[in-house]
């Protein structure tokens, strides 16, 4: 699973899983997990290139997240065995075209466009399962041009990882190499071409850094 981005078939992104993030965007705190899908073509591995800002969007936001890499196929997974299906983790960004998302929300349309552009799921690479000892105490941070914008802990999540796995697998089969993005803490905000975004997990050597550029059409 150390190259899950090459083998996984889907990215399941959980929304509004940190109460303060839900509030900062004016959303209600969910009573059950809420998720959407991102295409695997949106993966951008650390060191392989910049994040591209699409020409048709002027409000791109960073959202740092802990990613859960699924290690084996499962359906209707129960809470007690949920972690048996986890092979490891990744640090990820769920890049979001906020203006495109607002248009979709106003029209009651899916968020696919706002979340699915190429390079909109930057990742650090694979983090072995044993590197994170306490999944309920993982501090994530994100900076833009050296200024910290996001800092939050997984102990602030509304739904923990076993509950997310249980819920998602009750709807769709989770397969080896799939990635679950577990939500973002508060502090999301815009990035622009020419800026540099950096993210990390406190205490782990997982820092990742990406330049931001304006996309050039082929």
Curated annotation (Swiss-Prot):
Alphabetic keyword roster: Cytoplasm, Hydrolase, Lyase, Magnesium, Manganese, Metal-binding, Mitochondrion, Transit peptide
GO cellular component: cytosol; mitochondrion
Residues given in the record as Mg(2+) binding sites: 63, 65, 94
Names of required cofactors: Mg(2+); Mn(2+)
Keyword Transmembrane tagged: no
Span of chain positions assigned to the transit peptide in the UniProt entry: 1-18
Annotated EC: 4.1.1.112, 3.7.1.5
Family the entry assigns: Belongs to the FAH family.
Function description: Mitochondrial protein that acts as an oxaloacetate decarboxylase (ODx), catalyzing the decarboxylation of oxaloacetate (OAA) to pyruvate and CO(2), and as such is likely a regulatory enzyme in the TCA cycle. Also displays acylpyruvase activity, being able to hydrolyze acetylpyruvate and fumarylpyruvate in vitro.
The protein's name in its UniProt record: Oxaloacetate decarboxylase, mitochondrial
Organism from which the protein derives: Dictyostelium discoideum (Social amoeba)
């Amino acid at each position: 699973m150390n190259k899950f981005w090459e083998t996984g078939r889907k990215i399941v992104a959980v929304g509004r899983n940190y109460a303060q993030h839900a509030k900062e965007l004016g959303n209600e705190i969910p009573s059950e997990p809420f998720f959407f899908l991102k295409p695997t073509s949106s993966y951008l591995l650390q060191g392989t290139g910049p994040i591209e800002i699409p020409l048709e969007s002027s409000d791109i936001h960073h959202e740092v997240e802990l990613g859960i890499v699924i290690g084996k196929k499962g359906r209707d997974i129960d809470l007690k065995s949920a972690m048996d299906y986890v092979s490891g983790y990744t640090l990820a960004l769920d890049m979001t075209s906020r203006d495109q998302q607002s248009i979709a929300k106003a029209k009651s349309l899916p968020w696919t466009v706002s979340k699915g552009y190429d390079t909109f799921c930057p990742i650090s690479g694979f983090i072995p399962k044993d590197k994170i000892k306490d999944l309920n105490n993982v501090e994530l941070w994100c900076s833009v041009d050296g200024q910290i914008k996001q800092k939050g802990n997984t102990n602030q999540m509304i739904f923990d990882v076993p509950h997310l796995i249980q819920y998602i697998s009750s709807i769709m089969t989770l397969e080896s190499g799939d990635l679950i993005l577990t939500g973002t803490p508060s502090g999301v905000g815009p990035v622009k071409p020419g800026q540099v975004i950096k993210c990390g997990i406190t205490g782990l050597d997982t820092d990742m850094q990406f330049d931001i550029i304006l996309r050039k059409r082929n």
